[in-house]
Amino acid sequence: MNNNLYWNVYKSLERELLKLAEIIHIDDGQLGVYSMKIADLLIRTSVEIESISKELYFREGGTKPDDKDLYFDTDCLALLESKWSLSKKVVMISSPIFYLKEDDNIYLTPLHKAHKRGTSSADWQKAYQAVKHNRAKSIN
């Protein structure tokens, strides 16, 4: 796996999010704010999760063929969940330019339910699928 490739993309996404936080005062009351820039970040971040999950799937012993029937969530992330308990991993938002006070917004488990599909999946996945498949309807 080319770790530098993923790391560089991650750092770029992080920089863009921090730049956005200079424009939008991100606090507990602003989490419903929507913009095309946020949609773009959601799509690009989700694509990176898809890509790295598939690469890790094969590195960690996944056996399904790499074709249209290999799903990043129910196949790749499910295998990684069984090995690493990804759903229990916590990310803490600690940037001083995010004005979050509620613990539910500071301590995140972004991969909780990420190995599921549809209405059972993670909120970010539902948003990603909605924006990816019907952007015009999803932003109204």
Predicted regions and their residues:
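Charged alpha-helical initiation segments
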Residues: 1-44, 51, 55
